[in-house]
């Protein structure tokens, strides 16, 4: 029987640390899980790239053997750290053994701080769980094991001891004696092992092996991206911040002179007061609150709203993209984190990346100073920054599927792509409208946008937008054909598949009627039928967008794996339809472009535009 550091023994534990280090040679699969002291996890993201925090113990399971090896519990009960790490290193660096994690990025990141490289094929039960259902509310190990195994971790001793000590059972685990953590930690590894076995059956049953393999190969790419980070020119960043502050103050002064009062940029009430003082009208929400959309402010003819927009951009650049970046810098490098797939920390249902700590995907694209902010991002020393953009990636994917579906008019658009013509100009010619309108309407169709939202974007009446959308669908039939085909598929079977077989599910239901200005919550089928009676699948109007976004994710992720495995290049950053890398020469840049254009064969040619320069801003 063991006791904690403070010799409080109300809650007791029978758990003892292991005394053996069995060989894992010949084992096909081993599951590994880490317990950590990661005190800045919730505020700054995982601490491993910044060397903030530590590993307090490692659990391992081969199914028939499971053990937790504590090495740095502040409460005591630790084993010889050198012996443990030598053993864990021998297992992790044996490339004949497949390794399983639940959230692999986190665990292999922390293992790297112990100078342990995880070799062999990487599996992730978190990735498998998301591929099997991207619409879950929770992806924790407990949630997944409860659903698939009917098991979960026994946290009774851990929680009771933590409560006795006045600690948080998860965040403060490192402060506790290992005997109160051991049973919980062992379950982490054993349940991950058992869950992996079950999920692989489900992955095969759902024909998701190909996309699962790609996602697993991508784990190592993203880990290396995060570990290396991006060089940041902080001197340039601070100089730019001063320039932005001066410019913002000029706009604020001009607004004060114009309206006779201070304007708080991010307060709709303050902006409304400023509008009132100069007798300008503005829209309101359904509940009557002032509403200032970006489109409204940018397209207004008066000076005031345009100044509000410009000042907001300058303010956000300072707060989000200079101060926001600066606090994450470690040794002049930024280690932003990527949500590879849907999970408890974020991610998207489509398979596209999301980023956090910080979220670089919010970087403004069309802004005078957005380019200046990007100039603080540098390639590796002595190398060049390549920014490679897919040209009209989503319209090309739409056309690819329209051709496979034999939609009328799709061949004409394919021929335009082959000739290097612009997609939106082609649809504009087909609809006999200006390119600007064709682009807005076409993207609206792809994104499932209704005519009311389109009316706002085009600054026309809802009835005009409705008529224009109807005419567009008639004259550009391949888009309407795809929209209807994908929606019908989603309605009939509840799923659609992307370019590489990723499933998009529509498994929630809503009333089969519509009442203006009334919100109905979507629910699982039985619950919805009990609540509403006559129901239909929810969200199927987004099916085409899900297909295109998910396929774009497939193409982009396949590119990243190929660039890493075939060229030995670890990307710096991936945003939207853009891949950024550090390359040694123009030739390497051309090699990246070639892989991007040919990684997946489409019914239309993929086109990539790229620049090789000295920083991100100049390459964009």
Question: Where do the PLM segments sit?
Answer:
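Short active-site loop/helix that positions an aromatic residue
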Residues: 38-41, 105-116, 128-132, 272-279, ...
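A common structural junction motif
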Residues: 475-476, 594-604
